[in-house]
Amino acid sequence: MGSMAAAAEAAQEEETVVFRSKLPDIEIPSHLTLQAYCFEKLPEVAARPCLIDGQTGAVYSYGEVEELSRRAAAGLRRLGVGKGDVVMSLLRNCPEFAFTFLGAARLGAATTTANPFYTPHEIHRQASAAGARVIVTEACAVEKVRGFAADRGIPVVAVDGDFDGCVGFGEAMLDASIEPLDADEEVHPDDVVALPYSSGTTGLPKGVMLTHRSLVTSVAQQVDGENPNLYFRREDVVLCLLPLFHIYSLNSVLLAGLRAGSAIVIMRKFDLGALVDLTRRHGVTVAPFVPPIVVEIAKSPRVTADDLASIRMVMSGAAPMGKDLQDAFMAKIPNAVLGQGYGMTEAGPVLAMCLAFAKEPFEVKSGSCGTVVRNAELKIVDPDTGATLGRNQSGEICIRGEQIMKGYLNDPESTKNTIDKGGWLHTGDIGYVDDDDEIFIVDRLKEIIKYKGFQVPPAELEALLITHPDIKDAAVVPMIDEIAGEVPVAFIVRIEGSAISENEIKQFVAKEVVFYKRLNKVFFADSIPKSPSGKILRKDLRAKLAAGIPTNDNTQLKS
């Protein structure tokens, strides 16, 4: 029986319709550690600008960044960090983010990245789950972690000031008395180097274990080869505006820029005037954006085509972009190629990328999110039967390759539910591949709400809501929003006799979560629709929204 089952499985694998990049596979040096890979061409670029701090104007050459990462590694080791440990980076974009990440990598440690504007509860939960040994943060988050860290004996390093109970970044990491790390620790390509948190297709945030091999492969899939899919040149100036605590920016901006030898201009936060100023001053040529930034540029009368004339490439990820928006935006950036990518944290994160970005570009279609990256396989499966589908048939997108995650930290069950026995990562996204190998996303199986590219897990908000004494049951689903893409809205069942209002519920949630997880609207219902197994029927609730629901505080839905 066992041999028959194996034969049947092998036959099914042979019948699988697999899609690959139009670009040929390349040799990827996945035996290298991430830092060795990024600095492999250091002798050629040592004197070139590497990181430019948009706020202070400080410029760090490639040679300086490499040395400072060694110094940061020595500083982290002095704070007790060793191979297999975890460093929490609780920072907005800044040079210290790069020094810390690369320094931890040299020690064989992993970095778990988090948004400094998270609430204390959100930060503490991630730091505890990840097992952080050191927290590197900035002024806006010091108060959120100081007590938590002191209780657990975790050193806190502050990059931008002197605070009681913290050590300064310069003193801890960059002091001249600290000898830079001479030799990196013995690191295996399958050791974890990045530990971002993602909700995957469902549930609460989970630690995504990305290894040195994962990230080397993912970056190489983008920028390596004679005809790279993402053609970064050494003379390029890449804008690093999207938050580095998000894996897309860490991978496709910082690490890809380092590998290519480009200059990287770091912005701490989005400000349209500052963006224009930095673009003019430094001659920015590559600008990775998300659609909300594209919307603001497209609609702002303050931005002219002259302001952004140096930009030759605009990478848009995290959410789909319609043709009307593209046209309005391109009028402001007439010299640029605009294209989209498609990613998922668990996939390393890039699954697909626009081939108009290649050194030898291809014609691409509007609305496509690109073609699967090279050295990887993609298939479309029927979400109900698991059967493989062909071209122009919509189903769940699955990806396989060395770039995908090792698994979820301490969560084998969720790992098993996401990566099947054949090594295919199931994205929870519904899409199809057309006759030209271009991928189109049409729907989402997974529950995650995408607010301006940020993940909002419904389960997290639901768990919070039902802790309120006036709330009997709750469900959270996305509602379409022109600016944000999606916003979270809640369906609430009040306990008998309660008169709790929409505003009271919104305020209750706002105190506990980061700004982008706050509820946009609250609707009251007699009950939450659920399957026999108790699973919330989110499609039913989304259908109610699509049908149009009155939005006053007294809305009562009959289920």
UniProtKB/Swiss-Prot annotation:
Tissue/organ expression: Expressed in roots, stems, leaf blades and leaf sheaths.
Keyword Lipid biosynthesis attached: no
UniProt cofactor(s): Mg(2+)
One annotated Gene Ontology cellular component of this protein: cytoplasm
UniProt binding sites for CoA: 269, 452-453
Binding site for (E)-4-coumaroyl-AMP: 248, 252, 318, 340-341, 345, 353, 446, 450
Reaction catalysed by this enzyme: (E)-4-coumarate + ATP + CoA = (E)-4-coumaroyl-CoA + AMP + diphosphate; (E)-ferulate + ATP + CoA = (E)-feruloyl-CoA + AMP + diphosphate; (E)-caffeate + ATP + CoA = (E)-caffeoyl-CoA + AMP + diphosphate; (E)-cinnamate + ATP + CoA = (E)-cinnamoyl-CoA + AMP + diphosphate
Chain spans, region SBD1: 271-340
Residue sites binding ATP per the record: 198-202, 206, 340-341, 345, 429, 444, 535
UniProt record, GO biological process: lignin biosynthetic process; phenylpropanoid metabolic process; response to aluminum ion
Keywords associated with the record: ATP-binding, Cytoplasm, Ligase, Magnesium, Nucleotide-binding, Phenylpropanoid metabolism
Protein localization: Cytoplasm
Region (SBD2): 341-408
Cited CDD domains: 4CL (cd05904)
Induction of the gene: Induced by heat stress. Induced by wounding. Down-regulated by UV irradiation. Down-regulated by aluminum stress.
Nucleotide-binding among keywords: yes
Cross-referenced InterPro entries: AMP-bd_C (IPR025110), AMP-bd_C_sf (IPR045851), AMP-binding_CS (IPR020845), AMP-dep_synth/lig_dom (IPR000873), ANL_N_sf (IPR042099)
E.C. numbers: 6.2.1.12, 6.2.1.34
Recorded superkingdom: Eukaryota
Domain notes: Both substrate-binding domains (SBD1 and SBD2) are involved in the substrate recognition, and are sufficient to confer the substrate specificity.
PANTHER family: AMP-BINDING DOMAIN-CONTAINING PROTEIN-RELATED, LONG-CHAIN-FATTY-ACID--COA LIGASE
Record-given protein name: 4-coumarate--CoA ligase 4
Organism: Oryza sativa subsp. japonica
